[in-house]
Amino acid sequence: MRIHGEAFMARLLLAFTACLCGTTPCQAQELNAKIMVNHSQIQGTDASVFDDLQQNLTQFVNERQWTNLQFAKNERIGCNINITVTKYDKGTNVFTCKAVVQANRPVYNSAYTTTLYSNTDNDFNFEYAQFEQLQFNEEQVDNQLTALMAYYAYLIIGMNLDSFAPMGGEDVLQRCLNIVNNAQNLNYTGWKAFDSNRNRFAIINDYMDGAMKPFRQLQYDYYRNGLDAMSTNAERGRANVTTALETDLKQSHEDRPLSLLPQIWTDYKRDELSSIYKGKGTQKEKQNIYDILFSINASQNMAWEKIKE
């Protein structure tokens, strides 16, 4: 999937404005999700329920229009949701799972695709009966499974928009936060504050916190000003990445040291960041970036050491 930067943003903004004004019909799906349900840990159960779940979720996510924005088919956001079923109760239709959620973003004028988001949800639990018709009401969240899928749909779309325009995903991300607020009565872990500092509540609450505005700005400065610029001028692109890390990433960690967002971000950016600086840039630049990344995520030091090479 390739997106031609300014033209893509122009279409997004035009479509968004037109939709607000009611001047044009807005029908376009935003996501191109690959959903996998791994049930290898479950023995003695007819696999058809898991196949049906996978097919139903894929259809639900990809065929639903989540926003009023228009995306061409080749501009849809690529994402992967890999669900591992650890327990399944056929009598109650309860699935106990964990899920790895990953979203990707094409880099302008390049065949390279970068990771926009990647994290493991260890509380991806829900009820599902085979052949169940999935329904979702944003204002009345009463189904755990569709709430989970909607949460990640809005999170991914919002972060993608943030990467093309400063705070560009504000409205969509607010809808993600609304799902969390409306899901408080669901009897499932992951929606409430203080349960975990990296659960669904923590991720979107921290991301939308005013004190984390530098982290949101990072999405634009790193991807649009940094990676997208590399195809035409590698030195300028890397310099912009350096500025984004030295200002946005560093400040967000200093302003909210208890937030895990910077650490999660550096987890899935580890290899990309080391490749950007390995054998490139001045020693001072390399050392500055190393110090920032090590202070945020010392567990990835093997990758950070490559930056200094």
Where in the sequence are the language-model features?
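N-terminal secretory signal peptides that target proteins for export/translocation
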Residues: 1-9
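Sec-dependent N-terminal signal peptides
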Residues: 12-21
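Sec/Tat signal peptide C-region and signal peptidase I cleavage site
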Residues: 23-28
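Start-of-domain marker
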Residues: 29-96, 107-109
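A cross-kingdom marker for long, charged
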Residues: 36, 223-309
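Sec-exported extracytoplasmic/periplasmic mature domains
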Residues: 58-66, 158-162, 274, 278
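Acidic/His-rich structured neighborhood in mature extracellular/periplasmic domains
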Residues: 91-204
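Flexible, glycine-rich surface segments
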Residues: 165-258
